[in-house]
Amino acid sequence: MTTKQWQFWIDRGGTFTDIVALDPLGNLHMHKLLSENPEQYPDAAIAGIRFFLNTPEPKPIPVEQIQSVKMGTTVATNALLERKGQAVAFVTNQGFKDALEIGYQNRPDIFALEIATPKPLYQTSIEISGRLDGSGQEIEALELNAIHEQLLALKQQGYQAIAIVLLHAYLNPSHEQSVAQLAKQIGFAQISTSSHTSALVKYIARGRTTVVDAYLSPILRNYVQQVAAALPNVDLQFMQSHGGLTSAEVFQGKDAILSGPAGGIVGAVKTAEHAGFKHIIGFDMGGTSTDVSHYAGQYERSFETEVAGVQMRVPMLGIHTVAAGGGSIVKTHHGELQVGPESAGANPGPASYRRGGPLTVTDCNVLLGRLQPKFFPHVFGVNANQPLDLEGVKTQFKRLANTLNLAPEVIAEGALKIAVENMANAVQKISTQRGYDLKDYTLVSFGGAGGQHACAVAVKLGIHQILLHPYSGVLSAYGMGLAQKSIIETQSYAVKLSALATLAKQVQLQTEQACSKLTDQDEVVAEVTTTLYLQYQGSDTILELCLTQPLNDPQTPESLTKSLTESFHQQHRQQFGFVQPNVEIMINSISVEASSASHAVHNTPIQTKQKGLSTDTVPMFANGQWQQAKVYQREELSPQQSLVGPALILEP
């Protein structure tokens, strides 16, 4: 693959920003920076691009050398976690202004004596006239003059963002559109409507999703504009939570929550399929957390997810996150050793980074010899020119050892076991607890800390194969380059599966809308996928099945319904252990995804056919004792070569 310009694929994570660059000759290059390093640069992504183009500040970036930039970012996620979004006003029907705060009355901790109710993301709410019935028909008209005055009062109070959520708007968006038009005339900077944000049944989930969109979109837009200003006239794309790219101009807050991790799943799936593995567990261990995912032939997506204590109803890749990463803080609590959930982040980072940070999982690996300072570049400290601080780590572990009356190495190894247990439990939640047998799966390990813990996690889970791609340390960024642009259109339905054929026109309209939005981004539609979300009547458990035959085919109805019924029962039995053959199967919703052409995985050439030899020997603490571990360079290992441990395999 060759191009006359550079392409940049970037994953801006909580601790590190990874950049994969495709140069004009078709060669790939990798670079990793701290996401926050204010002494060195204002923005890590732009700093990485400057690094490859050899353009230091304050020179303008030579954008004529750039073909495209594809990014995943945690900006929206961090704003949600830290509750630093835009002040939002919530607009709804009369009698419903407290509905989102009341919610479903769920208690996250049912035995808690002191119940802490989550605070809503919006700061104020107003009720307006107008009403639709359950079929979307108007039963009370909007009083536009009165609504105009109410919105004007909000604007005068300083609100710039509003979330408009009206009853049954997913069936008829006209009322929300009229209110949004008034808000636009008044001058609100951010106007989110539920009929556009999440046109699905369930008022509470739809409303909360719309509020999240209004809360995060201004923050996200500021960051996008900041990047775009540094890269004028460059094709700038961002990864969405459902695993597809979109143009920067239409990137919304609701689609940005899993922007970074989604690139990792795409990268894991594409590289695993290229290597011949069809059933995988994605294991993405970064500095702050670990994301695990399940893949058995198709991307798993959830349309109702809770993120940072907020319920959202938009398509997201099925990712389970656990607060265990390289930066997870190791500490004691009432005499017990704990790992996480707090993280040292990028600043100050682990103790070994020489920025005054606490002991972390990374420091455990440094102390035990699994991370050797001499094999790392001198990029640490305030001036980014020092090696990892082994002596500082030893000093802090000695203090902890005095507290627990244990050897420092025993404490460090114990902390790693706790972290591995937490990560293995996360994998079990998305696999064995859903009826999948992991013995035939491959653990695809990636992320900056994945390679250090993949073997221990695989042993814990009974997985016999691990795939460590040569780009595993930057696989989320690499996944941005392999991803397709895609648009998903979802519509709620409450009909029996046996009546599927009657929805042909509605599904065709969804297809046309998805394809139109994709072509509006100057892309050619290469693939259209239709997915059904089914449930037993009276159940709230939804399973997804792909539609493999067109609905407008005269032969479709009977054969397709029979096939879908059998597949639904099979999947339900696998996951829950029983079926209900006499209960009607209902269509909850249907989604249509229009995608552009996929991108091929780059072949990584084998450097040698000779068996790689050990280049060094280093002390490593494993299984309760210090041992001598051989050191190998990954690029010098030959196919099918076996190694006897303990050993370190280095990937530059």
Summary of predicted features, one role per range:
Residues 165-210, 214, 375-378, 547-549, ...:
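Terminal amphipathic helices with adjacent charged low-complexity linkers/tails
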Residues 145-157, 264, 277, 287, ...:
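C-terminal, non-catalytic interaction/recognition modules in large multi-subunit enzymes and RNPs
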Residues 216-234, 493-509:
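Extended, charge-rich low-complexity interaction segments
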Residues 1-87, 133, 140-163, 173-197, ...:
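N-terminal glycine/serine-rich phosphate-binding loop of ATP-dependent small-molecule kinases
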Residues 10-12, 16-41, 111, 117-135, ...:
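Short glycine-rich, Thr/Ser-proximal phosphate-binding strand/loop in the N-terminal lobe
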Residues 22, 31-38, 89-95, 113-118, ...:
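Glycine-rich phosphate-binding loop of actin/hexokinase-like ATP-binding domains
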Residues 24-30, 106-109, 119-138, 159, ...:
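Gly-rich Lys/Arg/Thr-decorated short loops/hinges at beta-loop-alpha junctions or inter-strand turns
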Residues 87-137, 194-198, 479:
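Active-site phosphate-binding/coordination module
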